[in-house]
Amino acid sequence: MNLTNHFLVAMPSMQDPHFKRGVVYVCEHNEEGAMGLVINLPIEISVGNMLEQIEVERDLPVNNPDSLTQSVLNGGPVSEDRGFVLHQPKGQFDSSICINDELSVTTSQDILPLLGTSEAPEKFIVALGYAGWSAGQLEQELAENSWLTMEADAEVIFETPINERWDTAVARLGINPANLSIEKGHA
């Protein structure tokens, strides 16, 4: 089972504050483990303010200021000082992984001055930190019914308001959230 380009949707029984009602986009999953970004846990800073705080210098004018008002996300509890940009594939950056035709993840800083400009991917999210699982750990959590899984949908990532992403993902699975038990092992 390879869950790259899937969502992990936290079951109501999930109590870890990093993942409670969380939706994780799985960027990579293989025999060595898994890596993903929580896409619905905002922190109290906008992308634009973050860029100002880290003193990103721009050579191009900002032509999409609305994209800079979105919240930076807490991508997970691992390396919370490390940034990740999940975006539509566009441009060549020093450290990018093209996941599929709709999504890439970039960890190099060369993307930052372009955010909000005509050279940036039109749609993107910025996360600090990531969710990581060692070999077999995610599979164990799945066996314990900690997560529901579904194929990822870029519309949920880029078009759905942050606070509606969990409900939207559950609804797309055809499940009424009220019918999900908060106890593990029960429907």
From Swiss-Prot:
One of its GO terms (cellular component) is cytosol. It holds the Pfam family DUF179. It comes from the Bacteria. Belongs to the UPF0301 (AlgH) family. NCBIfam families: PRK00228.1-1. This is UPF0301 protein PBPRA3139.
